[in-house]
């Protein structure tokens, strides 16, 4: 893939450091590739997506290879999460998605790497290593820019 000048997308959650949770739609791996391939990553959200602690409200999507789903889920439970298989759904890459509920993410950068080191994980929906460069947030009365 060639370098992109910019990449514009939404997020399921964001914090003041412009770290994100994405992947509710199941395209997290391709979205992360696009974010890494862009000079500027612009995220457009509404105010309901803001949180002080990622993962508190929205589940973290993790793309897994089918044969590893149970093993990955056991590891995620050891880490304190409640993994739930997204039944009847496949990612854009034909893999399965496990959504991890009740999984507050205190240090997103570290957890992103830790989850990706579990054998069978393709990618997870934490965008902390490649976080947004700009967040455009719409409220009922205004548009705020976090850059």
Task: For each feature predicted by the language model, list its residue ranges.
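Conserved phosphate- and dinucleotide-binding cores of soluble alpha/beta proteins
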Residues: 2-147
């Amino acid at each position: 893939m060639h370098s992109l000048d910019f990449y514009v997308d939404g997020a399921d959650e964001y914090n003041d450091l412009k770290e994100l949770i994405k992947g509710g739609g199941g395209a997290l791996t391709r979205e992360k590739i696009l974010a890494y391939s862009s000079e500027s990553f612009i995220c457009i959200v509404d105010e309901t997506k803001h949180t002080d602690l990622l993962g508190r409200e929205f589940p973290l999507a993790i793309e897994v290879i089918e044969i590893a789903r149970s093993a990955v889920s056991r590891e995620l439970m050891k880490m304190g999460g409640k993994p739930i298989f997204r039944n009847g759904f496949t990612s854009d890459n034909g893999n399965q998605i496990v959504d991890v509920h009740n999984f507050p993410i205190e240090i997103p950068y570290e957890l992103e790497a830790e989850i990706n080191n579990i054998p069978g994980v393709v990618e997870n929906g934490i965008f902390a290593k490649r976080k947004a460069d700009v967040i455009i947030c719409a409220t009922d009365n205004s548009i705020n820019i976090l850059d």
